[in-house]
């Protein structure tokens, strides 16, 4: 999805210069993909960072990752050890460009395959999967042979769990999106040396690495220790983390922009060159993260915030898997709706028509030029 949007954002003038007789595959390989490749590679590396963050979050549900160690140390009050785990995690993310290089990719893939081959499938109870599919997820009225009670059961679940959880989820997500947009708008220039200088860009990278390294769940967990259980920790965690991600991606694009020889520096360059040229990617990334923020807002319910995840966790804790499945389905429908709405807004704003490219005066589509 994102790679498709990156292609949409790339300059299409080389495609037009090839003329109508060139086949689609050649157009893609020689006119579209080369322009989008740097952004695609940056995004692929970012997805690796997402995988590292997700692995850490899975530690909170029992997997022996760094998140498991962090949660254990916090529960035991060993804050020094928890700080060491966080330092290791930040170092792992900050050095990802050193240990994940293209020439090392094959070696990492072989290493991963060897590690996976040593993992044994955990034992499951006899018939556990079939029981889950044939009994646990079946609504209680149908399991009890009372189909007439299905609609009242759904209505009660909707009014007492889904609607309140959805309202809280949307409130948290919208406020977090506004904060993320504000953070990204400023952060995109913080890592560009021509805007903030080498020292400023280095400090900007450090701040963004820290905010990007910690999963939203971890940040919210830390903020809960300061502000207590409320929507504020979730809003701050989601806004800062997603804003840092968007700002990092935009900053990488801004650093790679081709500028004129007499281009200014500092805030003048940021306000009059970088912001207009990256407005399309800024809107596209914000709308893309909007859908993700919705899902993450729901997950925040596990920490006690009354979003959809709170009611989902409550249903699972009571072993009422049928209620949990309905809440999950509602969350999925909301996510699909937000995705459709974000696409419509992006098309309405024309974000896909604002390409990041360099103007070439006098170029005529379909004709070769002295590039």
What name fits each language-model region?
Residues 1, 160-173, 212-247, 279-281:
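Loop-to-helix entry region at the N-terminal start of transmembrane alpha-helices
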Residues 1-7, 186-222, 248, 252, ...:
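Cytoplasmic-entry segments and transmembrane alpha-helices of multi-pass inner-membrane transporters
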Residues 2, 24-57, 83-84, 91, ...:
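Transmembrane alpha-helices
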Residues 9-36, 63, 257-278, 305:
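Short helix-to-coil transition segments within interhelical loops
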Residues 43, 55-59, 68, 189, ...:
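Transmembrane alpha-helix boundary and packing residues in multipass membrane permease domains
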Residues 48, 70, 162, 166, ...:
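Hydrophobic alpha-helical elements at and bordering transmembrane segments
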Residues 65-101, 309-344:
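Hydrophobic alpha-helical transmembrane segments of polytopic membrane proteins
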Residues 89-205, 350-371:
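N-terminal, non-cleaved signal-anchor transmembrane helix
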